[in-house]
Amino acid sequence: MKPKVFITRAIPENGINMLEEEFEVEVWEEEREIPREKLLEKVKDVDALVTMLSERIDQEVFENAPRLRIVANYAVGYDNIDVEEATRRGIYVTNTPDVLTNATADHAFALLLATARHVVKGDKFVRSGEWKRKGIAWHPKWFLGYELYGKTIGIVGFGRIGQAIARRAKGFNMRILYYSRTRKSQAEKELGAEYRPLEEVLKESDFVILAVPLTKETMYMINEERLKLMKPTAILVNIARGKVVDTKALIKALKEGWIAGAGLDVFEEEPYYNEELFSLDNVVLTPHIGSATFEAREAMAELVARNLIAFKRGEIPPTLVNKEVIKIRKPGFNEQ
């Protein structure tokens, strides 16, 4: 009898097809997130669970899933999962690093360019008919923004995504500053990046991109005090997690001109609506789509499947998050 896996959203078919060869697969096909009560019902008889960032996988879920042996998160981040509790119960947790790195780094630069060059504002100007109504073909002071070439970029968080952002910055001949919990000496040599304390990165950079995981240390690390350190011409881009930035302080910074603009792909709560923030024309907003490319999402689905198939075969999953769980339970659905 095949082990049963429940997938909380319709991921790309390539991953589902791989899983169907080895598992009994059930997929939540609706566009909306699975309701909490329905999730608790569905996990009662599953051996494996594929989850999205929008699902909170905590003690309550584990208590309702006596057969659950592995949770495969369809994301690189896993702050939606109580990993400590999973480990205590001998439940393996995996994620999808690397495969979405380029897509997310691309999106960071898309937000940076869109904000620096008023792309969205210009688009609205044309679509609304305002350009036609003005009857002016071109004006030397319209939509003045900032060039990226030769400027200083500050990258907060210098893991895979942070370093991929730095590689793109090299193409713009930018000076690269970074802040990370640990020095990355090899990356410094490869990319010509310079380590600085966080406060110095904020002070010196023309553009700041946030690429840190959400932890106790990074929660609201960009607050009013630190926003005031930035240049009034600076642009902040957040492709990390919404709670890395104090939204109220950011709104104040954008309104009062402490910084020139912001590009945000992540928010404190998702889905998100904030009339005060959304009314500002110096911020570009996208709905958490950093990894939204055909290539990345299919690669994520394949990696999810590879993790589950490896576990089923008694092998350590390729991207195991909680490696200490191996001491508690060997991989495989028959292991106790």
Swiss-Prot record:
Annotated disulfide bonds: none
Keywords from the named record: Cytoplasm, NAD, Oxidoreductase
Record's catalysed reaction(s): glycolate + NAD(+) = glyoxylate + NADH + H(+)
Keyword Oxidoreductase applies: yes
UniProt-listed Gene3D superfamilies: NAD(P)-binding Rossmann-like Domain
One GO CC term on file: cytosol
Source superkingdom: Archaea
The keyword Transport is annotated on this UniProt entry: no
Annotated NADP(+) binding sites: F158, G159, R160, I161, S180, R181, T182, I239, A240, R241, H288, I289, G290
SUPFAM superfamilies: Formate/glycerate dehydrogenase catalytic domain-like, NAD(P)-binding Rossmann-fold domains
Active site residues of this protein: R241, E270, H288
GO molecular function: glyoxylate reductase (NADH) activity; glyoxylate reductase (NADPH) activity; hydroxypyruvate reductase [NAD(P)H] activity; NAD binding
Listed EC numbers: 1.1.1.26
Protein localization: Cytoplasm
A Pfam family of this chain: 2-Hacid_dh_C
Subunit structure: Homodimer.
Similarity comment: family membership: Belongs to the D-isomer specific 2-hydroxyacid dehydrogenase family. GyaR subfamily.
HAMAP family reported in the protein's UniProt record: GyaR
Protein's name in the database: Glyoxylate reductase
Organism: Pyrococcus furiosus (strain ATCC 43587 / DSM 3638 / JCM 8422 / Vc1)
Gene designation per UniProt: gyaR
